[in-house]
Amino acid sequence: MSLRFILGRAGTGKSRACLDEIAQELKGSPQGPPLLFLVPEQATFQTERALATMPGLGGTIRAQVFSFRRLAYRVLQEVGGSARIPIGDLGKRMILRNLLEKHKDELRLFHRSAGQPGFADALAGALSELKLYNIDATSLDRCQTEVIERQGAGLLADKLHDLALLYGALKTFLEGKYTDPDDYLHLLAQRIPGSVMLRDAEVWVDGFAGFTPQELSVLAALMSACRRVNVALCLDPTELDEPCDLDDPFFRTRETQAKLLQLAFDRGIVIEKALHLVPAPGQSAPRFQHPELQHLESFYFRRPAPPWLGGTQSLFVCAAANRRSEVEGAAREIIRLCRDQGYRWRDVAVLLRDLESYYDSIESVFSDFGIPLFIDSKRPAPHHPLVELIRSALEAVLRDWAYEPVFRYLKTDLVPLSRGETDRLENYVLAHGIRGRRWRDREPWLFRRRLTLGEDALSEFSDQELAELAEINGARDRARAALASFHKAVVGAKAVRPITAALYQLLVDLKAPEQISCWIAEAEAAGRIEEAHAHRQVWAAVIDLFDQIVESLGETPLDLATYAVVMEAGLDSLKLSLIPPELDQVFVGSLDRSRCPGIRAAFVLGVSEGVLPARPKDDGIFDDKERERIYALTGLELAPGSRRRLFDEEYHIYVALTRASERCYLSYPLADAEGRAQLPSSVIARVRELFPQVTERTWLLEPGSLPTGAGLSGSAFAGAATAETAAMAQTALAARTTKEAAMSAVERELAEEYIVHPARSLSYLIPSLREALARRPVPLVWWAVYSWLAERPAWRELLARVLSGLWHKNREQDLPKPVSRRLFGDPLRASVSRIERFLACPFSHFISHGLRLKERRIFRLAAPDLGEFFHAALKQFGERLRRDRLDWGALPREELFRLTGEVVSDLAPQLQNEILLSTARHRYLTGRLQQTLSRAVIVLGEHARRGQFRPLALEVGFGPEELLPPVQVPLTGGRWMDLVGRIDRIDGFFVGDASWLRVIDYKSNRANLKLADIAHGLKLQLLAYLDVALRHGNRLLQGCALGEDRPSSLSAATACHPGGMLYFGICDPLLSTGGPLTRDEAERAILKEAKMCGHVLADPAVVAAMDGQTRQGYSPLIPVGLKKEGGFYSASSVLTMEQFALLRQYLQSIVARVGEAILDGLVSIRPHRRDDRLACSFCPYKSVCQFDLLLQDNDYRLLIDDPPEKIWEKIAAGPKAIFEGVIR
């Protein structure tokens, strides 16, 4: 029984010496006593591989590789102690959460923090630390007593009391049934003397810089039980007799050697002569193939140190703009090494101190470059379908089958629905607001959306509707079956075990195990071994999570909401530990845990200030001062504090600088992910000090500008087709003499650095091709890249797609006239809003009315729904007044409120499948709608009281099978266009045998109408409605029901004149005043806010018929101001009879031109821009047209608001000048 050290600095061959000695033993006696190689957990696979590939060994069972944890499993299986149920980290946290609640009255300090997120994690970490350092509850009690005796009660004493209490409670809970994995090494140390396997065994220990007290106990037991224990440590054997300071990189290993020597001395273990691995004078260590790297290893931590004279060929310092360019630069250099220097992927390692920040960039960039890699890091699995299924199933039950969790559940591909069925089901659910009971009951869904409010419900479904409903209900039954059973099982459950059992039954009902097995088989068949392994691990981890929850909380009373929180924490903690799927791949690891022996080139990324060396975090139960006080007062040793961990960073730096045998790259980004400037680490400064002429590089994301040299002019390239361009480039290259075509040194350097992978080279090629399109010269190297890609079938298609993007013009070709007429109909039938849409952008009109694309319907109360509701309500209100022969202006307020209440009660259930009755919020909104409607009818009543205009018709339709015929607009070639629509309200005023008509359009918010709006074609509705009313005025007058107000002089010959065209905003305005108002003042202010907008006839008599109480000043009802001496203020919105006539002619011209353009197939992408208002702002088809100002053919059609005089001139000239950009 003896102890022997194998000592040497980095690269001297310590690991190789261990392997060689094991190999020698195996060759000498293949059947002898066991040979154990003890290494860190993360190094077991690499060490097993190294041992298995030792030349001349073949298969053996005598030599085995173990980590401390794996050795514990093996020994406990042999001598007993492994039968108890292990409790993992999650189980321990849940147990501690229960113990905190159970003992909260006894806790002195922790009761305040017990419910805080993360506290149970911190507490579990503290107890694990105590176990690793062999401190039990009794020791904590003694420590607390000594602290109180020597410095009195306080925060530290209370911490120690609570920790001792919870430590003891945890031990009592686990005793006799469960095993804490943190106790495995303690049990191992106790069981080693009884192990037959370890008798006469020889042990090699390698890869450790230090050991916890638990691990030291195991090593002490091994020294007593085994024939010999060999421990390899990284330190300088020539400096063993010299003092070692805390900032020495070998301080930790020197300290570790001292502890092992003391353990051996205390147990009477023979200490053999150490094996010192020291290079001969003037020679490099076996690892380092270049003296520069040996110089770096020898002198980095020595001061003063001789600088390296001359440049470097194996040491490089690289600066990058950001992390992405840093990773891409490393990827390009790795490919260059493998392409030009004979490296294999496995000869390269990428090392980082902060792997998490670089993880996503490395994974995506290396994949783009085609570099196989293995990232030595446990990966979270929060987005795996199985994890998402569990999370969303619990959330669906808790949120009463709300849309979001239900469809996250259905989209996991673990539910027996195809993706198409899921999409159709989702559309139906969104359109009808289905949730809760409607999902769970067995009644079939027969919802359908009404087209307009107030229509009678259709009694029968069409055959197509029945088929669609049958498909929807079939998909719904399969979607709900398993989840409904789960819901029924867990709703009444009050303990952990039945809820977990129901969750497992849900997976069984869905046949999740079988589906995951299929995914594994598919992945393996496609060669995606890593993906298959991930599926296996996730399933195993989820089942283990269920076991942990049941074992730790079992019959603990827990409601479903709390259970979901516990399960969420467990799912978030799932990590995937992946074994390298290939032998030849780049290794990516972190400096503090990964081992990567035998590499030729190391890329150390992220060598930035604050990252390497890393800033220690002090986030445990004990801070640094408390750790020092505990040690000073009681002698109990805890884990190193942040100050000591900061010095340990020096060892990580030493490891990083000495991993590679041939090349070491140190790189740093100049900015972080948010664009903030970052400084290089002190490591960079020290390397520059030690190597004044170190080779420095800059890694750019894309190649910078180059001299064009013998580059091919882009003028010939511009506008050419793909095949023509290929021939052109080939001809140009072949035609040049050798001297002319030779690449410059700069270009060749560029080619060597950036042209390393076809896909990435193609992305770098694109900017150069853009330069060619702009008729600027392009460096010859990019034409060479172009030719290489064009000559190879594997890349030719991708190149063609890229080039098609360069020539892409986002410009739609007009439709052939026969196609357009079949698509839009001939004769064309169009509403005024359709005309306005075309004038806003022809392509938007094509999508909405040609292809008839519609946005997905969603069960919510949007602005159009409110508009529809108010239109229907005012129509119904007006019809009731007409039916009961009531005068709008004479009704008292109480009667108005009663009538609006009845109207709202009648219409509310009809809006979107009772949306206004669906929730308390919507029921409250119904009351607000009634209040707004009441305010509107009060204002309209004021119009009736103060004026003489009376409603002639409400909701008047014009078109086929409507009250009024469509407006037939003649087009060229004998064609015509039918203009159709619906007018909210037409009012009339009569004097003798003449009448004046005005049209009113209801808006759910305030709207304005400027002359420029009409001129630009943006707001034509009011003008078109007035034109229709005037065309059919006599028919309206004959059919109206004015009752006693109907003048006897009305006849078919009555002349109809334009009275006005007005918007009425339906709103309940919120007043902003400087002080309190009386009731009358408030009413006047509200009336002013609800003033109609638009244009009225410039006739005082007509104005008086609209507001007879305003003799001078501005009317509170209409947009008119009267001067005292007569006439109108300039701000009045009035038009003369001639101007109304001119606008009507202008309207006819616009409609005719638009009709011609539609039937001629005009579908151009030409949105307008008016000041800062864009046609695209509220267009639902932006993703379809892909309008982009960066594209040459995409630009806005600018609309400029001219002064009124100039607008009238243009209106008189017709629409040609104004709509030149839209209509040909």
Curated annotation (Swiss-Prot):
The keyword DNA repair applies. Keywords: 4Fe-4S, ATP-binding, DNA damage, DNA repair, DNA-binding, Exonuclease, Helicase, Hydrolase, Iron, Iron-sulfur, Metal-binding, Nuclease, Nucleotide-binding. Its EC number is 3.1.-.-. Binds 1 [4Fe-4S] cluster. Residues 1-326 form the UvrD-like helicase ATP-binding domain. [4Fe-4S] cluster binds at C841, C1176, C1179, C1185. One of its GO terms (molecular function) is 5'-3' exonuclease activity. GO terms for biological process: double-strand break repair via homologous recombination. ATP binds at G8, R9, A10, G11, T12, G13, K14, S15. Residues 283-584 form the UvrD-like helicase C-terminal domain. The keyword Membrane does not apply. Its cofactor is Mg(2+); [4Fe-4S] cluster. Despite having conserved helicase domains, this subunit does not have helicase activity. Belongs to the helicase family. AddB/RexB type 1 subfamily. The heterodimer acts as both an ATP-dependent DNA helicase and an ATP-dependent, dual-direction single-stranded exonuclease. Recognizes the chi site generating a DNA molecule suitable for the initiation of homologous recombination. The AddB subunit has 5' -> 3' nuclease activity but not helicase activity. Heterodimer of AddA and AddB. This is ATP-dependent helicase/deoxyribonuclease subunit B. The lineage of its organism: Bacteria, Bacillati, Bacillota, Clostridia, Eubacteriales.
